[in-house]
A protein has these predicted regions:
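Class I SAM-dependent methyltransferase Rossmann-like catalytic core
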Residues: 1-33
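Class I SAM-dependent methyltransferase SAM/SAH-binding core
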Residues: 26, 34-88
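A short acidic, Gly/Pro-enriched loop at the edge of an enzyme's catalytic core
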Residues: 84-99
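A short glycine-rich, Lys/Arg-flanked "PGG" loop and its adjoining helix->strand segment in the class I
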Residues: 112-127
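Short, glycine-/aromatic-enriched active-site segment of Class I SAM-dependent methyltransferases
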Residues: 133-149
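Short alpha-helix
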Residues: 149-172, 176
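Conserved catalytic loop of SAM-dependent methyltransferase domains
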Residues: 170-195, 203-205
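C-terminal lobe and adjacent flexible extensions of AdoMet/dcAdoMet transferase-like proteins
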Residues: 194-238
Length: 238
């Protein structure tokens, strides 16, 4: 599948994209919020969610998988970015306390390898957070948004995939209950619609925000015996 950066940028610059970020950020804040100093890796396209400073401050490194797109690196005083090979991350084993993944799992053709590589760089009992399109939603069936142009997952599918790759204690929350249209009335009342949708259609939100914990004794299956690093390994330890 294709990682279309232009489509993502255009969507998140639209009114629909902006209210989508607001709804997703409310869930992210719960999973990323911590008073502890932690190493957190952002993987995929997570730039829209960094506009909220309290979320951006939790993430100290952005890792953007290599594509045919010309990617403009994102830099500010809080985050640094690097383009990487999705199956051979240039980080040490057990490097990060948390990994936050957005707009990649649903477009990658090498799911097992990607997840096992993210498992490798997580510390013991580390947490991984995904934003994943929900297959039982209107959003995944309309192509005017990035969640409708990729491979969606059901709650049971993503749980099974993560279990097989060495993750447990999987928590799933839903958001984006308002329909994916740029109507002024909808945009104005998106919070009300979101609350009604959550109450009436709990498992039908457009996006799943998922947190899973690394299972220390599991060894994810890899289809390759070894990987060649195309960048020097990066350590975040001072």
């Amino acid at each position: 599948m294709n990682f279309n950066l232009k489509d993502l940028i255009e969507f998140y610059d639209s009114e629909l994209g902006k209210i989508s970020v607001i709804s997703i950020q409310e869930k992210l804040h719960r999973f990323l919020d911590t008073k502890l100093k932690q190493n957190v890796l952002g993987f995929g396209y997570i730039i829209p969610y960094l506009r909220k400073k309290d979320i951006a401050s939790k993430i100290n490194f952005l890792s953007i998988p290599s594509t045919n797109n010309k990617i403009k690196y994102y830099r500010n005083e809080l985050n640094a970015s690097l383009e990487v090979d999705e199956t051979s991350l240039p980080f040490n084993d057990l490097e990060f306390d948390k990994v936050f993944v957005s707009h990649w799992l649903e477009v990658s053709d090498r799911l097992d390898l990607v997840i096992s590589e993210l498992w490798r760089v997580l510390k013991g009992q580390g947490k991984i957070i995904f934003i994943i399109p929900n297959s039982f939603s209107l959003w995944s069936n309309i192509e005017n948004n990035p969640f409708g142009k990729c491979r969606p997952f059901s709650k049971s599918q993503i749980k099974k995939l993560l279990n097989l790759q060495g993750f447990e204690e999987i928590k799933v929350e839903f958001c984006l209950y308002f329909p994916p249209y740029n109507y002024k009335l909808l945009v104005k009342n998106h919070k009300l619609i979101e609350n009604i949708g959550r109450a009436l259609f709990r498992n039908m939100g457009g996006v799943m925000v998922i947190e899973a914990t690394k299972f220390n004794y599991a060894i994810p299956k890899k289809q390759l015996k070894a990987y060649r690093y195309i960048f020097p390994k990066v350590s975040l330890q001072q």
